[in-house]
Amino acid sequence: MEDKRRRARVQGAWAGPAKSQATAQPAPTAENNLQQRPGKAWMNKEQHLSDRQFVFKEPQEGVRRAPEPRVIEKEGVYEISMSPTGISRVCLCPGFVDLKEADSVFEQLCRDVPWKQRTGIRDDVTYQQPRLTAWYGELPYTYSRITMEPNPHWHPVLLMLKNQIEENTGHSFNSLLCNLYRNEKDSVDWHSDDEPSLGRCPIIASLSFGATRMFEMRKKPPPEDNGDYTYVERVKIPLDHGTLLIMEGATQADWQHRVPKEYHSREPRINLTFRTVYPDPRGAHW
């Protein structure tokens, strides 16, 4: 036992004095940290931040954005698209009816036209059209499952306007659909005037009186978009008191149009849409 104690004392002498646990260690500094060798996940310690190169990779598929609407305000003829169907064209003529005459026409039509709110059917659900309408023509006209009965009793003012449009455009018409938008809440939803009774590439002459409303158009999407209108071309045309707008060519085949509701107060507006209706679609110009 005594030999074991002696050997332990000898071994302890070689260890030297024990270090106190209270001895303070130097605090790590930013300089010390920078001198430490980083792990494999970081860069070489001698490479500066400014020397690093970041390589931007283009996405494999481009970001698709909806185009900004084209606004048409000035008088002129505009080809808005071209497709295998043909050229879609609109002609804008502000002030076609001068201000004094337009005021008189508006007052007479508000008073004399037999305006009526009709019931439409959409997705087998009936609804009240958010506007008043009237029909003039020797033939009936059916759209949105609504049939307008023949009405050959043209108001003299309407006949005068029809003749004036025909003389200035070279087009002839035999029918007229009248629309009265009573206020900002009245509207017409997206549609095309492409009923079979109108024939192929129908010409529509639209004459406006009263408050200015925005006429909007959107191009029909290609088949691969499966009816998605998100990225289609769009056109906006403000229609003022006395303005004439002609839609022709493939416009009804390739585009839709509407007059949307508005958030701000609007006075009444009358829109006259002259067109040609054929008695037998098989005899139309297809």
Curated annotation (Swiss-Prot):
The modification (4R)-5-oxoleucine is found at residue 177. Signal peptide: none annotated. Substrate binds at residues 115, 141-143, 194. Its cofactor is Fe(2+). Activated by ascorbate. 2-oxoglutarate binds at residues 179-181, 269-275. One of its GO terms (biological process) is DNA repair. This is Alpha-ketoglutarate-dependent dioxygenase alkB homolog 3. Gene3D superfamilies: Alpha-ketoglutarate-dependent dioxygenase AlkB-like. Binds 1 Fe(2+) ion per subunit. Fe cation binds at residues 191, 193, 257. The keyword Cytoplasm applies. One of its GO terms (cellular component) is mitochondrion. It catalyses: an N(1)-methyladenosine in mRNA + 2-oxoglutarate + O2 = an adenosine in mRNA + formaldehyde + succinate + CO2; a methylated nucleobase within DNA + 2-oxoglutarate + O2 = a nucleobase within DNA + formaldehyde + succinate + CO2; an N(1)-methyl-2'-deoxyadenosine in single-stranded DNA + 2-oxoglutarate + O2 = a 2'-deoxyadenosine in single-stranded DNA + formaldehyde + succinate + CO2 + H(+); an N(3)-methyl-2'-deoxycytidine in single-stranded DNA + 2-oxoglutarate + O2 = a 2'-deoxycytidine in single-stranded DNA + formaldehyde + succinate + CO2 + H(+). The gene is ALKBH3. Interacts with the ASCC complex composed of ASCC1, ASCC2 and ASCC3. Interacts directly with ASCC3, and is thereby recruited to the ASCC complex. Interacts with OTUD4; the interaction is direct. Interacts with USP7 and USP9X. Its EC number is 1.14.11.33, 1.14.11.54.
